Amino acid sequence: MSEFHRLYFDELLFDFPDLVKVQKDSYASFVGGGDTGFSISDIFASVFPVNDGYGRASLEFVSCRMGEPKHDEYGCVERGITYSAPLRAILRLVVFGDETSGEGSEGVSTEPAVKDVREQEIYMGDIPIMSKNGTFIINGVERVVVSQMHRAPGVFFDNDKARSISGKLNYIARIIPYRGSWLDFEFDAKDVLYFRIDKKRKLPVTFLLRALGLSNKDIFAQFCEVSECRLTKDGKWTVCFVPEKFKGVRLQYDLINAETGELVLAKGNRISIVLARNLYAKGLRYCYMDLEVMKDMYLADDLVSTKGEVLLPHGTKLTKEHVAKLEFLDVDSIKLVELKGNYVFSTVLQYDCSYEEAMLSIYRVVRPGEIPSVESAEKLFESLFFSPERYDLLNVGRIRLNAKFNLSHDESLTVLTKEDIFCTVKELALLQREVGDVDDIDHLGNRRVRSVGEFMDNQFRIGLVRMAKVIVENMATADFDTVMPCEMINSKILGAVIREFFMSSALSQFMDQTNPLSEITHKRRISALGPGGLNRGRAGFEVRDVHTTHYGRICATETPEGATIGLINSLAIYAKINKYGFIETPYRYVRDGRVTDEVTYLSAIDEIKANICQASVRVDEEGYIVDDLVYCRRNYENVFIPRSEVQFADVSAKQIVSVAASLIPFLENDDANRALMGSNMQRQAVPLIMPEAPLVGTGMEGYVARGSGAVIVAKRAGVVQYIDARNIVVASESKDDFWIDSYTLCKFRKSNHNTCIHQRCVVHQGQRVKKGDILADGPAIQKGELALGRNLVVAFLSWRGYNFEDSVVISSNVVRDDLFTSVHLEGFECVVRDTRLGPEEITRDVSGVAEEFLHCLDEFGIACVGANVEAGDVLVGKVTPKSSSPVTPEEKLLRAIFGEKAIDVKDSSLYLPPGVSGCVVDVKVLQRRGIEKVGRALLIEKQAIDAEKTRRDHELAVLTNYIYSLLKEMLVGKVALSTLAPISKGDLITEEALEKIDRENWWKISVDGISSIKLLRQRFVDRFDEINKTYEENFEKIRGDDDLAQGVLMVVKVFVAVKHTLQPGDKMSGRHGNKGVISRIVPAEDTPYLADGTPVDIILNPLGVPSRMNVGQILETHLGWAAYNLGKKISKLLDEGNYSEVKSLVLEIYKNDRKMMARLNEMTDAEIVEYSRSLRGGVPVAASVFEGPKTDEIERLLVLAGKDPSGQEVLYDGVTGEKFDRKVTVGCKYMLKLHHLVNDKIHARSIGSTVDTQQPLGGKSHFGGQRFGEMECWALQAYGATFALQEMLTIKSDDVVGRVNVYDSIVRGDNDFYYGVPESFNVMMNELRALCLNVEFCSDLEKKKDFGDLALAASGQ
């Protein structure tokens, strides 16, 4: 049974997906292809073939493949290079001759004949590879490509938000492609319809329609509402009654039912839409039409007599005379169009034009300043919207257009069609008539996610297009008789474009690697910023706000607190992104009122019409919904519906939150703002050297630990054959399929944020493991569960003012036991260059440096691993040649002795900067190719090769032992067919006899079934050679040289581990947004203690709870207190040997956890007791989000632990020993240490001066300071601190003479010294003299009087 099992208060019905699947799947589709359309092969196929433009040659794409990376992931980090693989493509150059082949319609040759074909595999560049954890390693640094939320391609309808003078909204439509020109339609205040291309000058829509080839008759058919009037036998005209046409109309004639002759409404009545629909429902289908109404209407079709004669052409406006002649004309029907409401037709009437005029006008708008022709205008118009090379809607854009307008075009059609434009114009006209609704741009059905694969597709396409232009240029000057494809390719272009994206794009970000949670959150982040996205300065409230479609897709809690709030979000834990880029969330099918286990994913568009109930709906044992009426969501509104109409159910109550928010127990009891802070602060928690999983968790801790990639997980089931501090070897037990998996543990590896990545083995040799079992814990992980902090005994108590305003009081026990001690790795780099005066040199012999600063260096001048270093110590000794100086007598002597000039060098060593001290844990030496390796580099290389050999030997030993055990089974019990002492021919082979023979000679024994033994031996040899080959390749990589920058000979990297203990000024927090700074570390004997003498670990201010409204921390404290004391109770019973009580207590604790009870019932008493030993530190519980324990369950556990159900305890003051006046809330709470450490912030500059008259700026990193300025002087004046003020202005400023005097006084032990004149005062004096003002010091009273008289005279008094 697993050692770590939480007490659950709910059931997990749907397992969690891979939490970084979004990144992995997107990149896999780019590299390997898929149904997304973004793949390397698709891009090659879209750009190639490339023709030279003269029909002489064509370069075609055949296929491509990705090679293997040169180094593994960690090797690239060590060397500071990109983790990438070479891309090679097979290109075919087809050269055409002068003659042609093939025949046209008249027997004339049409196609050029192929003269020559040359194929070649060409290196196209290096493509960055995604690591197994979903990151990229660029120049040795792990980076994450954040997914981007942007507006989906397709059509959008909106209004201008500002009403016109008439009070009417003007509506707009916009067709946005993924790539290509935008097409906008808009109304002006006079209801004239215009269009724009790429937001340029607008034109009436008539020009677009004419350019699309529409005549007036076509426009009538497409956009106008035609009323067909028929002549009855009694000579009256009837028209079809359409309720929408009569909306808001005041009748100009009596409304009479043409079928019954009944008067429905009298003339002058106004018809509302409701009344019109009621009349239609009562049977009104046709009504009589007054001839007077036909006046000012237009003919939608030619008015043709019954004999076929055209009496009036279409488009004719009916006048009073025309209407009067209707009854005399030989017609039985007429199609009419009313100008009111037919905005397209009215625009055509106002701004009519011909086809040629339309084309030329559009050309002038798109390309102003050029002289157009009709042919060039036609080509331009065709390329704007109907050419796949310049216009692309993607499959998602086509699907959205099809869904919006009920079209049936194929997904592969990714350009606009005429029908798309017609439907857009018709829909916009309906909106202007206030029929229909505008689109909500914040609806997730209108926004899609672009992931890393799509970004790579765009960059790759840009690179290939640039390469194609270069190919065309090279073809122009190429000799096609001899040229090969590789001579026309510049492979640097593609790599440069991709490199530019990873290095400069706002969406390629330095990975947040503080802890495993911060990593996984960064990979699941979705940003609305970046290229093609929003600008945080202009983004309004609506786009930042929570939307109803975010339910189950985007977390409503987790987002940054600053200027990007609402623009950067996180995926909900169950959400995934489909092939079109839309976010989907899972639901369980509900059939006939029964909630099934069948799960489907729905996008925001799919679930609009669905009836979806909550995961907490009450069901019976068979899954049938109990209640007759169920609270559901339909069209994003909450309604009660019958259970038979329910279609889907949420899979879990926690599906609406992100990974970080799902780790907060009792999240439902916290204010949203504090939950946001809690989510963000968990990502800032520093991994501790002794991590501890929370007693009160949510059940998500294990999933996050696995999904982060920080732990080592067994790939296959097997047996652990070998373990040490760095390696784990697992082998199979199968006789048919034998394999060996070797795992290497990370040791003291530096993260992006200088935290320590260190893995610890959690299995033992001989242990059987299943696929997916945890083999090694990583940073901030314990027993396979995320462990960001520690469980502490907390008291909510105001204590002597030390926890005022969120300050935190800590017991010295916490510091003494290193509960919150963390290790941080600082990396320092020393670069050895080849200068113009000669190469720099690594050496221990650095002149002018005291031996005490060189103590950690080895004989080669590089710090030893394991050395303790302090600020100012030399990590790498290095000297640099200096320029020549005048020859001294000593130098003359050296030249005379050695016959050459002695090298003049200066110290350029790498020193440990101020404020840093620790232990050297690793040294890396990288050397340029072609340079002989120095001693330390050879030593490091030998250590690495020895480590690889040790791993190889372990694998070979496991393989050998396994194979010989199988061979032994085959031989024992069989009759020998040959003699091999001590076994004779005909003897029965026994184990004892085999033990006397060397194992290598067992293969020589001949028995029946020798073919199977030969097969076993062949398998053994093949596997043996495979292992050796793998490690030989590793040896070559280790021995290989490094590619360094130009002029760099060597790079030495030294990593120093710095231990940070908890101290006042460090920032701590809980998981509920409750943060504070440590104000004091109190001796354990002075801290408040419980009745049994147990001192509390931490004291928090109770006033921090009610105003912040994060009551979840109180519930966590109570439940943690119960869990902690249950562990103490179990421990006491175990120590007493009362095992029956232990079993009863364990069964009572888990009685409401059905899965755990089922497992406990299968265990024996001894196994239950053994399991209970793992509960000594407390019973871990899972308070899932929205499904945690209720108050009565917490009280039950408190009573079971023997504690007051109120959760309060009697506390005694540790200083006085007196009992506090009332009971205090005491419990066990999970606390985190955040990376805002006081050691990284507090900085004191107590040495040295600065440049005269300038400020000592530069900050902590340069050991700088800040000026004691004017306002600071005022403060000292206000306090009357005259001597301190004088010191600040003189010897502590820029009084050079005074500083020398102070130094002399300190050396003599004298307290008296004299101040000098500050240099800044001398500067002021010289500036006054430059203004012809002479300033002198005077001490004589007479001189003062003289100066006073002069001043009075100058003022005229």
UniProtKB/Swiss-Prot annotation:
GO terms for cellular component: DNA-directed RNA polymerase complex. GO terms for molecular function: DNA binding; DNA-directed RNA polymerase activity; ribonucleoside binding. Keywords: DNA-directed RNA polymerase, Nucleotidyltransferase, Transcription, Transferase. The keyword Lipid biosynthesis does not apply. It catalyses: RNA(n) + a ribonucleoside 5'-triphosphate = RNA(n+1) + diphosphate. Transmembrane segments: none annotated. Disulfide bonds: none annotated. CDD domains: RNA_pol_B_RPB2. GO terms for biological process: DNA-templated transcription. It is an enzyme of class 2 (transferase). InterPro entries: DNA-dir_RNA_pol_bsu_ext_1_sf (IPR042107), DNA-dir_RNA_pol_bsu_external_1 (IPR019462), DNA-dir_RNA_pol_su2 (IPR015712), DNA-dir_RNAP_su2_dom (IPR007120), DNA-dir_RNAP_su2_hyb_sf (IPR037033), RNA_pol_bsu_bac (IPR010243), RNA_pol_bsu_CS (IPR007121), RNA_pol_bsu_protrusion (IPR007644). Its EC number is 2.7.7.6. The keyword Transcription applies. Pfam families: RNA_pol_Rpb2_1 (PF04563), RNA_pol_Rpb2_2 (PF04561), RNA_pol_Rpb2_3 (PF04565), RNA_pol_Rpb2_45 (PF10385), RNA_pol_Rpb2_6 (PF00562), RNA_pol_Rpb2_7 (PF04560). Signal peptide: none annotated. It comes from the Bacteria. Belongs to the RNA polymerase beta chain family. The RNAP catalytic core consists of 2 alpha, 1 beta, 1 beta' and 1 omega subunit. When a sigma factor is associated with the core the holoenzyme is formed, which can initiate transcription. DNA-dependent RNA polymerase catalyzes the transcription of DNA into RNA using the four ribonucleoside triphosphates as substrates. This is DNA-directed RNA polymerase subunit beta. The lineage of its organism: Bacteria, Pseudomonadati, Pseudomonadota, Alphaproteobacteria, Rickettsiales.
